[in-house]
Swiss-Prot record:
GO cellular component: plasma membrane
Domain of life: Bacteria
InterPro entries membership: Gly-zipper_YMGG
Key words of the record: Cell membrane, Lipoprotein, Membrane, Palmitate, Signal
Residues making up the signal peptide according to the UniProt record: 1-19
Membrane topology: Lipid-anchor
Organism of origin: Aquifex aeolicus (strain VF5)
Lipid positions (S-diacylglycerol cysteine): 20
Protein name: Uncharacterized lipoprotein aq_615
Record PROSITE patterns: PROKAR_LIPOPROTEIN (PS51257)
Compartment(s): Cell membrane
Amino acid sequence: MKKALFLVGLVFTAGVISSCGGVSSQRTYEGAAVGAAVGAAAGVLLDKENRWRGGVIGAALGAILGGTITEIAQRAAKEAAQNNKPVVYRAEDGSQMVRAEPVEKRGNCTLVKTKYYQNGKLVKVEEKEVCE
């Protein structure tokens, strides 16, 4: 019974991840892959009873979180470049925040600085060019 429920959950998770394919970019897939790798490693280390289960669950959750954060950051950067003003996305619980701010216009492209916050602390800053 546990195996059947696990397989159903795994198939459901795979379906959810693959259904996002219409709007995803290469960077979203890369974010999901990194999230899956980190999640799998954490799951293996944390689930001492069944390391395979921990790895699979960690990979699934990590892929979803990594892909989602990457997609949100890309959307924020694109909106900031198009509207020429800062854009902020926050998680409902306030634990995560992405802030994208246009820095400089270069022809058809805009340099956007994206800051990632976790629990109110700055964890990452990146600059990227967003072109029309």
